[in-house]
Amino acid sequence: MFKHWPSAILLGGLWLLCLTVPGTASFNEDTQAPISESAVAKVGNCCTALSLVLQNSVQYPGILPDDMYWSLQEAELHPSCVVTPSNRDEVSLAIQILHLGSKYFPDRCEFAVRSGGHTPWAGAANVEAGVVVDLQRLNQVIISAVKTTVNVGPGNRWGDVYNVLDPQGLAVTGGRLATVGVGGLVTGGGFSHFSPRYGLVNTTQHRIIECGKFACDTVDNFEVVLASGQIVNANARSNSDLWRALRGGSNNFGIVTAFTMRSFSQSDYWGGSIISDGTHMDKLFRAFESFTSSPTYDPYATNILNLIWQPATDSWITLQSPSYTKKQVGPPALEKFTSVPSFVNTMRISNSSDFSKELYSAPGQRQLMITATFQISMAMLRAIHTIELQTVPALRNASGLQWSLALQPQPAIISQASARAGGNSLGLDDSDGDLFNVLLTTTWVDKKDDPLVESQSRRMFEQFQAEAERLGVTNPYVYLNYAASWQDPIRGYGDVNKAFLQDVSRKYDPYGLFQKAAPGGFKLFN
């Protein structure tokens, strides 16, 4: 795997890297030993070692782009350096240096891994005084000769992927926003317009763990750099436990350098946005409940219902994002939604590239996301909005506040699609029945408002949970890619799945590099 590198690299008089890698796959780090530990210790810090080995692939603060991170909380952190590897071998070299450096000077070798930088909470994909491994140069989108799979690099954003696939009449179960990164969405699950048909963005052949309607369900192979620096493939035939774990297990096992995703033929389809005033809220709740729990759910249909508060006028509007992944206008499955009077309607026949750019939230503001999952219930839908109405008055003076609560159907058909595709590590099962996801996305300007916005929003979700318990509609699943820093999505996968993920971590990362030295994300042993 290191055929492009010399057997050793001379670093300022130090033989830093002795790249002799065993030919057999073994995950005992003692058998890897590709790096001279004493040499790394003498260099003094990881950024120096990385700069000497990877040279122009290492950058320092002051020359980094302003839009590296979506949220201001992430952008406010100051890494000591940023590594932008151009291929899997450079990722491997970086990880080997970070692995040894974390033993000798852990205070200077913590690291974070960045794909698109869309997770908003501080430290998710950035690190103070540490190293960011930025995957933006791993941006290949390569369609197989027979057009059944696509090799996608983690440094892509979904808009980049669709720009390649749409002209070929192809699609993958990818993200719905152009600016979201591929790597985090796939390894964390991933909702898609195509999920009712194909499952989540990443599923496996093991029924014990299932994705549902996420991006994780359709990944045939993960190319992964392990903590040892070894590069392996994880699929149904090789390292199948790692394959399953990566379908929802996030950044806990290694750095994925390529996803082989199943592709399928896809024509242009119907989608867009519909904005209505808040007087139609209850009618939309009835439509949402009926749609999500329909025994004849149309797998081509999806919709997201956003409840948006406008602080300046203390008024409400709704924003719908329906899609029907056939070239058909006004399908019956979505009629109860689309018949609601509106003052903005952009519904049209177009493609994923176009639709993914429609709803855009600019970087550079303070952001918060919180999520929960409940069994579908008209009483719960109404309770959510009632609690929301009681919460927002306290936030009226937060500067530049934007508030949106999204409701997303998660019918049992999606878990069934995941089961057909294989499974994953999310713990969802069609026996859970018809569910729906709740996502709060709120944006504001001034850091002084952080405690107010965060405390009120967190309290609101605690009230949601209490009401769900009263109504008997709870579900433990917390979608990792939407979760706030204080939530525990791994626990929501269930004890069996969490134990499985921990076992996989011990096998492929026995030192615990991705648990100890990479503090961002949701860890397995908390």
What is each PLM-predicted segment?
Residues 2-5, 13-526:
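Soluble FAD-dependent oxygen oxidases
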